[in-house]
């Protein structure tokens, strides 16, 4: 296993970690029931846009 040759500075460490932040998922609102859903996914009520694609239970 590799061993580091020199200690990394705080600046270099933080620059490396600058791309590690997570972003929240973008959500849309169902036109029929008003629930939040992911884009390009079928809503839990069974609607995909203005098409009914599955039965709601």
Swiss-Prot record:
Record's compositionally biased regions (Basic residues): 7-18
Keywords, comma-separated and alphabetical: Ribonucleoprotein, Ribosomal protein
GO biological process: translation
Keyword DNA damage: no
InterPro entries registered for this protein in UniProt: Ribosomal_bL32, Ribosomal_bL32_bact, Ribosomal_zn-bd
Alphabetized GO MF terms: structural constituent of ribosome
Segments for region (Disordered): 1-21
GO cellular component: large ribosomal subunit
NCBIfam families named in the record: rpmF_bact
Protein family per UniProt: Belongs to the bacterial ribosomal protein bL32 family.
Protein's UniProt name: Large ribosomal subunit protein bL32
């Amino acid at each position: 296993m590799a061993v580091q040759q020199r200690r990394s500075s705080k600046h270099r460490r933080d620059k490396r970690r600058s791309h590690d932040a997570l972003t929240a998922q973008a959500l849309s609102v169902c036109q029929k029931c008003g629930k939040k859903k992911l884009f390009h996914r079928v809503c839990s009520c069974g609607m995909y846009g203005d098409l009914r694609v599955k039965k709601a239970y």
